[in-house]
């Protein structure tokens, strides 16, 4: 998810453990981030059956790439790996806050309140459009050591988790945009094609 939410991000909290990676990255992401139109973004991801050092290495590379791209979330499919793995840090401007690592995440409950808010995506750079999502969620997942976890999330964190989890099912945020005129205009402006959107609204 693209970092377009600095004011809300300052009010959000994350939890998780990971090797400390500097957030002020320069240069290009170490991993290629695939863009709208690439087939890999439309595939369903597979569950991770064993959380080992190779998975932890991948999470570190994803976190570095997310920071280098100035993002607040990145899903494994965005780097061409169809595994159920997400890294998130909505506290991008807080150097002390640790990123959240979600392995095999599953949302167990959605709140009843819906909110519309502007989203962006590292796979669709430059495009920012409103998307309606539940404002609160509960989920279960495994951390980078393979331990089962549960958590509640609201606000920007809940939105970012839902956005990144969509990637695991081959869904992009533009698929959820209801204003088709705005969608078409933004896509054309940034050089993307409307035919690559699969509307689910």
Curated annotation (Swiss-Prot):
Binding note for cofactor: Binds 1 Fe(2+) ion.
The reaction(s) this protein catalyses: N-terminal N-formyl-L-methionyl-[peptide] + H2O = N-terminal L-methionyl-[peptide] + formate
GO-annotated molecular function: metal ion binding; peptide deformylase activity
Name under which the protein is recorded: Peptide deformylase
Family label: Belongs to the polypeptide deformylase family.
Keyword entries, A-Z: Hydrolase, Iron, Metal-binding, Protein biosynthesis
Region (Disordered): 1-24
Function: Removes the formyl group from the N-terminal Met of newly synthesized proteins. Requires at least a dipeptide for an efficient rate of reaction. N-terminal L-methionine is a prerequisite for activity but the enzyme has broad specificity at other positions.
EC class of the enzyme, as a word: hydrolase
Recorded superkingdom: Bacteria
Gene behind the chain: def
InterPro entries, per database record: Peptide_deformylase, Peptide_deformylase_sf
Cofactor(s) listed: Fe(2+)
Any one biological process term the GO annotation gives: co-translational protein modification
Active site per database record: 164
Keyword Hydrolase: yes
Binding-site list for Fe cation: 121, 163, 167
Its EC number(s): 3.5.1.88
């Amino acid at each position: 998810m693209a970092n377009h939410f600095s004011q809300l991000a300052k009010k959000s909290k994350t939890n998780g453990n990971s090797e400390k990676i500097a957030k002020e990255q320069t240069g290009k992401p170490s991993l290629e981030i695939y863009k709208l139109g690439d087939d890999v973004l439309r595939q369903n991801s597979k569950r991770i059956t064993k959380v080992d050092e190779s998975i932890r290495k991948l999470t570190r590379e994803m976190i570095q790439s997310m920071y280098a791209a100035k993002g607040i979330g990145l899903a494994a499919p965005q780097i061409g790996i169809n595994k159920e793995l997400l890294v998130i840090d909505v506290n991008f401007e807080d150097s002390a806050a640790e990123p959240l690592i979600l392995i095999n995440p599953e949302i167990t409950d959605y709140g009843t309140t819906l909110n519309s808010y502007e989203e962006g995506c590292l796979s669709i750079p430059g495009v920012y459009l409103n998307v309606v999502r539940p404002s609160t969620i509960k989920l279960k997942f495994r951390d980078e050591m393979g331990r089962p976890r549960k958590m509640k999330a609201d606000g920007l964190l809940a939105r970012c988790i839902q956005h990144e989890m969509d990637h695991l099912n081959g869904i992009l945020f533009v698929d959820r945009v209801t204003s088709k005129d705005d969608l078409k205009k933004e896509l054309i402006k940034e050089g993307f094609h409307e035919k690559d959107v699969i509307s689910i609204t």
